[in-house]
Amino acid sequence: MELGGHWDMNSAPRLVSETAERKQEQKTGTEAEAADSGAVGARRFLLCLYLVGFLDLFGVSMVVPLLSLHVKSLGASPTVAGIVGSSYGILQLFSSTLVGCWSDVVGRRSSLLACILLSALGYLLLGAATNVFLFVLARVPAGIFKHTLSISRALLSDVVPEKERPLVIGHFNTASGVGFILGPVVGGYLTELEDGFYLTAFICFLVFILNAGLVWFFPWREAKPGSTEKGLPLRKTHVLLGRSHDTVQEAATSRRARASKKTAQPWVEVVLALRNMKNLLFSEMWDIFLVRLLMAMAVMLYYSNFVLALEERFGVRPKVTGYLISYSSMLGAVAGLALGPILRLYKHNSQALLLHSSILTCTLLLLYSLAPTMGAVVLSSTLLSFSTAIGRTCITDLQLTVGGAQASGTLIGVGQSVTAVGRIIAPLLSGVAQEVSPCGPPSLGAVLALVAIFIMSLNKRHSSGDGNSKLKSE
C-alpha cells in the first residue's frame, strides 16, 4: 500500500492480520460444514437402522400369527403344535447370549448380515415345508439367528452418547412396533388367497433379503486399522449425536480382539465369546437381570389369558378384544416418541424412571385384575402400553450403562435370554393361576412386579452409572 509514493509500514501488520482472519474464517467455515455433513450422515445412519427394525418385525409379524394354524393344517396335534412352538423359545434362550457375544467379537456388520440372511433362509424353508418335520426344521435357523433387533440395539448403544441412548432406542422400538402393527394386517390378507401361507412366507423371505441389502449399503465408514476403539471405523470429521463418527462401523469389538482379528481362528472367537458370557453372568448385575425377568413375566401373565379373561368376565367377543390389543400396540409404539420429554424431566436418570414405570405397571395390573367395568380395562390397558414400553427401554439402557459398551452385544443377548426364560415359565404360571380365577394371571403379575420394585428399591447403586461391574473393567 502506498501513500504519496511511499510504503506505509503500519499496513504490513494489518495486512497479515486480515489474511490470518480470512484463513481462520475459512477454517471455521470448513469445520462447520464438516460438522453439518457429519450430523446429516448421523441422522441418515440412524434412519437406516430404524428402517431395519421396521422391516424385521414387519416381515416376522406377517408369518408368526399364522404358524399355529398352519402347523395344525399339516396334521399336528395340539400337543405337538405346543412343543413346536416351545422349541423356538428354547433355541432363542440358548442362542441369544452366544450370538450377542459373537457380535462383540466379530463386529456388528458381519453378525447383523449373517443373522438376517440365515433368518431369511429359515423363512424360505418355512414356505417350502409340506409336513411337520420340515416345519420344525425350518424353524431352527430363525430360532438360532433371529437376533436382528438385539444386534441393532447393541449397535445403537455403540454409536450414540449415553444420555441420548434411551431416546434413540425408544425411537427404534417405535419403528419396530409400527412394523409389528402392519405385518399381521398384510399377513391376514395374504393368507385368504390360495396357498396364502406359502406366499406370505416367501414375501417374508424377500423382506429379509431387502433388509440385508439395506445393511450392506449402510453408510459404513472405512477406517484405518487401529483408528477406532471397539472396532468402529470412522472419519474424524463426522459426528454422530455428539460422539465421533469413529464409532459407526463394526461396533463393539475390543482393542485386543481387533488387534488379533487377522490371526484369530474361529475357536478363539468362540472362547472369547464364552469368556465374556462368564464374566457377565458372575458380575454384580444379577439384580438388573432379575428385575428384567420379573417385569417381563408380569407383562406376559397379563397378556397370557387376555382374550379369554375378557370373554369370561365381560362377555367381550375376541374380535373386539383384538381391536383393543391393536390399540394398545399402537400406543406402545407412540410411547417411544414421548421418551425425550420424560427423560429430560428425570434428568436422564434411567433407574428412577424404571422404578416409577414399574410402580405404575404394578398398580395398573392390579387395577385390571379388579376392574368392575370395561371402561376400567380400557384405561388400564392404555396406561400399561406406555408404562411397559418405557420400562423396556429403561431396563435395556440400565444394562448397557452398568455393563459398559464393550460388551453391549453380550449384555443385550443375555437380556434376551432372560426374557426367553420368562416366555417358558409364564405360560406354566398362567395355567396354574387361571385354575383359581380368570383374574389370577394378572394378579400374579402384579405380585411379581411388586417383588421387582422391592429389589430395585434395595439396589440403587446402579443409578450413578459408575460402571462397577466386572465387564466394565474388561
Curated annotation (Swiss-Prot):
Changing V84A: In a breast cancer sample; somatic mutation. The keyword Membrane applies. Changing G59A: In a breast cancer sample; somatic mutation. Keywords: Membrane, Transmembrane, Transmembrane helix, Transport. One of its GO terms (cellular component) is membrane. The keyword Transmembrane helix applies. SUPFAM superfamilies: MFS general substrate transporter. Residues 1-33 are annotated as: Disordered. Pfam families: MFS_1. Residues 19-30 have a biased composition (Basic and acidic residues). It is a multi-pass membrane protein. InterPro entries: MFS (IPR011701), MFS_dom (IPR020846), MFS_trans_sf (IPR036259), Sugar_transporter_CS (IPR005829), Tet-R_TetA/multi-R_MdtG-like (IPR001958). It is found in: Membrane. The chain crosses the membrane at residues 45-65, 80-100, 116-136, 167-187, 197-217, 288-308, 323-343, 359-379, 436-456. Its main location: membrane. GO terms for molecular function: transmembrane transporter activity. Gene3D superfamilies: MFS general substrate transporter like domains. Belongs to the major facilitator superfamily. This is Major facilitator superfamily domain-containing protein 9. The lineage of its organism: Eukaryota, Metazoa, Chordata, Craniata, Vertebrata. The gene is MFSD9.
